[in-house]
Amino acid sequence: MAFEDINIIGSEWIHENGFKILDVEESHALIMAAGYLKHNSLEGVYFRGQSTLYPELRPTLYRGIDSDSAKYNRESRMNSKINEYREVCSAFSKFEDYAAEPLLQHYGLKTTWLDIVDNIWVALWFACYEAKCTRDGHFLHFQKRVVNEVNKYAYIYLIGADLEYRKKSKPGYWHGQSTELVDLRIAAPSYFLRPHAQHGLLFRCKGVEGAGRPLDYSRQIRGVVRIPLEKAFDWLGNGHTVGIHSLFPPAFYDNGYKILLQSGVTFYPRDKEIGVVHTVGA
């Protein structure tokens, strides 16, 4: 049975912005929806929390552009910045090149990868909080969303990623015809703590010969769940295991984060399109 045909107590199917989405009123219904896809899929199914239902699913590096020239320009600048980290951080010699870009994405760089998680409650937290950045992009703060008439829901995307192939030479890396997937808890050293705290994985779509990587990854969306924001806050409660301090461990605890912050790699205003390793207020 297709996901869009399932019937779960405590939920109903609705249409919003061209999507058929599952509107969930009970926490058990949320868990059942997530579990159904994971059990019935031949691919890996993961979660991504969103505050808004967007028509596209773009990685941060590709947002706000539409031309190949702009795409390749950003990719070139991003790769140059990654190489700067490789040159000055000996930690990058402790893992393979395939993990460098997704790791830096996890700490703030804008890349071709998208963050996903395999814990539904972590995804829900990201759907309930919004990130606020200083103008220069260096300092990041998360704040609780305010429930009002235009800000009533949290969304969780269910994302499919290929698991057909993996290599012993690439721990934590899977790929198939459509996507690549990296689990940083395996691919990167454990002193990079944030991926473990967030149950963090990343995926990206593969390109086709002659056209390159697509700007929009929405072809991998397998379902969308909507939760009333007020109920989502109630389900999350006030526990410390899912909160800013635990999901974004300070550099005092996250030695990998400290290495990046102390690397000496600089970011200038012209680097805005490729992001920065943020200092997160926790």
PLM features: residue spans?
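Catalytic-core elements of nucleic-acid end-processing and repair enzymes
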Residues: 1-282
